């Protein structure tokens, strides 16, 4: 996954840099100095996170779609799956002081336009992954890796839901994020059992 990771990291670093300078596509925000190191004023961990959850989101989409999986459908559902993760990520990172919004939004201080920007950026990430992964990436010997990626997406959804409900004591984020990630995860896991 070196090539896919490199392309995703470079592209999302550029998107994040443009975002902090122009407000597009997420809205006006700025990274604090809490996350280091930074590249072009973007914490290095941020583009890595896009890739680290992009692959599981894509595989969850593929598994959920089953026999109806096509590149366009994987891109669309994978983008929704990745954006659903941000329903947990952004409230946590804003709460920890890793980035700040110029104007508080209605969802835990996050503007709703951020999630539109996430979906648009996720479309680019999913399109890149679709182009860079070979057409047979989902057959002949990849079942274990694919299952692990579905497991990772599901684990993140479950643990984030429990974490916000129990430890962060934020039932709103637990419910909203859970409703975003867990249905996709459940259908993806069922798809793995369908075979």
Please give the residue ranges for each predicted region:
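Transmembrane alpha-helix/helix-exit interface in multi-pass inner-membrane proteins
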Residues: 13, 17-21, 79-96
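Membrane-interfacial catalytic/cofactor-binding modules of polytopic membrane enzymes
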Residues: 93, 97-115
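Small-residue-rich transmembrane alpha-helices that serve as helix-helix interface/gating elements
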Residues: 172-187
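Internal transmembrane alpha-helix with an interfacial aromatic "cap," most often the third helix
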Residues: 11, 27-30, 47-71
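Membrane-interface loop-to-helix entry segments
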Residues: 38-56, 110-124
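Internal alpha-helical transmembrane segments of multi-pass membrane proteins
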Residues: 66-80, 136-152
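Membrane-interface capping segments at transmembrane-helix boundaries
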Residues: 135-137, 189-195
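Conserved small/polar residues in nucleotide/adenosyl-binding loops
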Residues: 1-4
